[in-house]
């Protein structure tokens, strides 16, 4: 039995994760974490998630929770994820990170600490999105430089980072396939007399509104034709299922940094 703890247990994603763990054979929820000021501390994590009592109380004591845990799942914010990663290194525990918005410096810190323990870091745990990643690479390689690339992503009005980590990863995959530097090719804003589009640009547009779970479309636009690769998330359950699959896969792996492409055998 793989023992799993969830950080951000009282949040929307945390509830989905707890439910998915309960429904997955071979996994056991052994810890549920929230920040020290959370009004949900001391509550049964299963009742909070809406999946019935689990006799696991929500706590803010990360070190104590990790003592009884094999894998920690963290969908929070980069600063929190880094602190939790450091704790996992201290306790020699594995971690699945679904947080997005890491700076280059923060990402370098993740890379460094992943030399000590198994780490899954993925901007999107959805199987469908990761299939799209593979399709984007193949499409870019086939189409080459003759098609302009634009990316549009939509999310709910509570999302804090922009563009989404998934959209950035899509841009990176396309740029790599075309032999470009994503950081030099990405264009996040166009306004006024900004001049004609250059062939190297990868445009990135963001929409925020309502309760959109997540939608990403990559446009390959040529002369007289257009290809669109779109993924639409209907609920957060698919992200939770992917994260739980990652936790199951990660148990017993060698130290290193992995992503969903490793887990799905797409590399």
Swiss-Prot record:
Task: Report the subcellular localization.
Answer: Cytoplasm
Cross-referenced SUPFAM superfamilies, in alphabetical order? Glyceraldehyde-3-phosphate dehydrogenase-like, C-terminal domain, NAD(P)-binding Rossmann-fold domains
Its UniProt entry gives the catalysed reaction(s) as:
(S)-2,3,4,5-tetrahydrodipicolinate + NAD(+) + H2O = (2S,4S)-4-hydroxy-2,3,4,5-tetrahydrodipicolinate + NADH + H(+); (S)-2,3,4,5-tetrahydrodipicolinate + NADP(+) + H2O = (2S,4S)-4-hydroxy-2,3,4,5-tetrahydrodipicolinate + NADPH + H(+)
User: What metabolic or biological pathway is this protein involved in?
Assistant: Amino-acid biosynthesis; L-lysine biosynthesis via DAP pathway; (S)-tetrahydrodipicolinate from L-aspartate: step 4/4
Residue sites binding NAD(+) per the record: 8-13, 34, 98-100, 122-125
Sorted alphabetically, which InterPro entries does this protein's record hold?
Answer: DapB_C, DapB_N, DapB_N_CS, DHDPR_bac, NAD(P)-bd_dom_sf
Please classify the protein's predominant subcellular localization into one broad category.
cytoplasm
GO molecular function list: 4-hydroxy-tetrahydrodipicolinate reductase; NAD binding; NADP binding; oxidoreductase activity, acting on CH or CH2 groups, NAD or NADP as acceptor
What this chain does, per the entry, is described as: Catalyzes the conversion of 4-hydroxy-tetrahydrodipicolinate (HTPA) to tetrahydrodipicolinate.
- In its UniProt entry, what is this protein called? 4-hydroxy-tetrahydrodipicolinate reductase
**Species:** Syntrophotalea carbinolica (strain DSM 2380 / NBRC 103641 / GraBd1)
Q: Which gene encodes it?
A: dapB
């Amino acid at each position: 039995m793989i023992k799993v703890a969830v950080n951000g247990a009282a949040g929307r994603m945390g509830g989905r994760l707890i439910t998915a763990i309960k429904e997955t054979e071979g996994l056991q929820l052994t810890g549920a974490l929230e920040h020290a000021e959370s009004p949900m501390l001391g509550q049964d994590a299963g009742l909070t998630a809406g999946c019935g009592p689990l006799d696991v109380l929500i706590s803010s004591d990360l070190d104590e929770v990790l003592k009884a845990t094999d894998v920690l799942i963290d969908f929070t914010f980069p600063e929190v994820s880094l602190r939790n990663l450091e704790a996992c290194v201290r306790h020699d525990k594995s971690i699945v990170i679904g947080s997005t918005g890491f700076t280059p410096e923060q990402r370098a810190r993740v890379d460094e600490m992943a030399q000590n323990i198994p780490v899954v870091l993925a901007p999107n745990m959805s199987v469908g999105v990761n299939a799209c990643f593979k399709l984007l690479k193949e499409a870019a390689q086939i189409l080459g430089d003759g098609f302009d690339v634009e990316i549009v992503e939509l999310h709910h009005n509570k999302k804090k980072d922009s563009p989404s980590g998934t959209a950035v990863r899509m841009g990176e995959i396309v740029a790599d396939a075309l032999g470009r530097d994503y950081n030099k090719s990405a264009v996040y804003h166009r306004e006024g007399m900004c001049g004609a589009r250059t062939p190297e640009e990868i445009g990135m547009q963001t929409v925020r509104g309502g309760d959109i779970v997540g939608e990403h479309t990559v446009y390959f636009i040529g002369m007289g034709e257009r290809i669109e690769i779109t993924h639409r998330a209907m609920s957060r359950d698919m992200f939770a299922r992917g994260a739980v699959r990652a936790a199951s896969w990660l148990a017993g792996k060698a130290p290193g940094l992995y992503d969903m492409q490793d887990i799905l055998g797409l590399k």
